Curated annotation (Swiss-Prot):
Subcellular location: Plastid, Chloroplast
InterPro entries in the record: 2Fe-2S_ferredoxin-like_sf, 2Fe-2S_ferredoxin-type, 2Fe2S_fd_BS, Beta-grasp_dom_sf, Fd_pln
PROSITE patterns: 2FE2S_FER_1 (PS00197), 2FE2S_FER_2 (PS51085)
Designated name of the protein: Ferredoxin
UniProt keyword terms in alphabetical order: 2Fe-2S, Chloroplast, Electron transport, Iron, Iron-sulfur, Metal-binding, Plastid, Transport
Main subcellular location of this protein, as a coarse class: plastid
Cofactor or coenzyme needed: [2Fe-2S] cluster
Highest taxon of the lineage: Eukaryota
Positions of the 2Fe-2S ferredoxin-type domain: 3-93
C-alpha cells in the first residue's frame, strides 16, 4: 500500500506519497526534501519527529523508549507509514530536552 505523508517542517508543510515498505526519511529524500539525520539506523535522535496524525511502524529503531513513542515521537529513518500520516519534523531538541 502507499500512503500520503505530510511533513510539517520549519520551512512549511510538504506532502508526498510513501509506500509502506519504504522508510519515510528515504522517500522524503527521493522527493527532494532535506531532513535532518545522522546514523540512519534508528539509534540516535537526529531525525526525530512527532506524529500528529496517523500511525507508523518504527520497530527497526531502538533509540526511543515506550514513553517517547507513546508521546508520538518517531525516528523518520526507520519509520514505515501504516496509514496516511502527519509528522512534525526537526524535533530532536524537544525530544532530548
Amino acid at each position: 500500500a502507499t500512503y500520503k505523508v505530510k511533513l510539517v517542517t520549519p520551512d512549511g508543510p510538504v506532502e508526498f506519497n510513501c509506500p509502506d515498505d519504504v522508510y519515510i526519511l528515504d522517500q522524503a529524500e527521493e522527493e527532494g526534501h532535506d531532513l535532518p539525520y545522522s546514523c540512519r539506523a534508528g539509534s540516535c535522535s537526529s531525525c526525530a519527529g512527532k506524529v500528529t496524525a496517523g500511525t507508523v511502524d518504527q520497530s527497526d529503531g531502538n533509540y526511543l523508549d515506550d514513553d517517547q513513542m507513546a508521546d508520538g515521537f518517531v525516528l523518520t529513518c526507520v519509520a514505515y507509514p501504516q496509514s496516511d500520516v502527519t509528522i512534525e519534523t526537526h524535533k530532536e531538541e524537544e525530544l532530548t530536552g
